[in-house]
């Protein structure tokens, strides 16, 4: 995400981004982050 943000900046509004479980708890890692702007995006 950092790499994408550095290249293309942030979009509004914030959105919940869920990552695959990085631990043995098996829960999705969901946190509020800025949407990532893709080049050519209409948003």
UniProtKB/Swiss-Prot annotation:
Any one biological process term the GO annotation gives: envenomation resulting in occlusion of the pore of voltage-gated potassium channel in another organism
Pfam (any one): Myotoxins
Tissue-level expression: Expressed by the venom gland.
GO cellular component, one term: extracellular region
PROSITE patterns found in the cross-reference section: MYOTOXINS_1, MYOTOXINS_2
Entry's transmembrane regions: none
Bridged cysteine pairs (disulfide): 4-36, 11-30, 18-37
Task performed by this protein: Cationic peptide that possesses multiple functions. It acts as a cell-penetrating peptide (CPP), and as a potent voltage-gated potassium channel (Kv) inhibitor. It exhibits antimicrobial activities, hind limb paralysis, and severe muscle necrosis by a non-enzymatic mechanism.
Protein name: Myotoxin-1
Organism: Crotalus concolor
